[in-house]
Amino acid sequence: GIFEGDRYFDILVEYAKFSPEQIAVRITATNRGGEAAPLNIIPTMWFRNTWSWGQTPLPEPTISAAQGPAGTLCMVADDGETLSDRRIPNSHRLGRRWLIGSTKDAGAEMLFTNNETNAPVVFHPGGTSLSRYTKDGFHRLLCAGEKAAVNPDLTGTKAGLNYSFVVPAGGSVSVLLLF
């Protein structure tokens, strides 16, 4: 079975209210197996896709790379230029939100794509996606090595910080974030 030989990771996610508008997050992964094993931890932020509904698409929110404190990677999400969708009761905007990740103990890279369906994969091979960069972009990059699956311009409606580790047997790694 899946737990045979303890070849799995325990993942602990801790949240602490840092201030009225900020949450500190620590993600700790422990390798329960008897051998070192690779692990990618990808804290992700995305906007719910309501802009492509209906006949007339609405303006899209954006997530982009931003300058953060030394020793961090930073991205900013902003829906301030979007329009409220009347089809959603109590529709609201979040304004600007930042995701800041420490790079002190681990290197990381920012990944960007769009929260759009990969139509040829989901619907049929001749389908056309609404965006060149689709929501499965991180998977396509990490599992198939498809570098063109993520946006090199570091912008999109879905983004993540990719922390790549080789975790020793019985060892742990942690990722520190501020949201």
Predicted regions and their residues:
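Polysaccharide-binding surfaces and accessory modules of carbohydrate-active proteins
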Residues: 24, 29-134
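Short, structured patches in soluble enzyme cores that scaffold and shape functional sites
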Residues: 13-17, 29-31, 179
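Intrinsically disordered or highly flexible coil/loop and linker segments, enriched in small
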Residues: 20-21, 51, 172
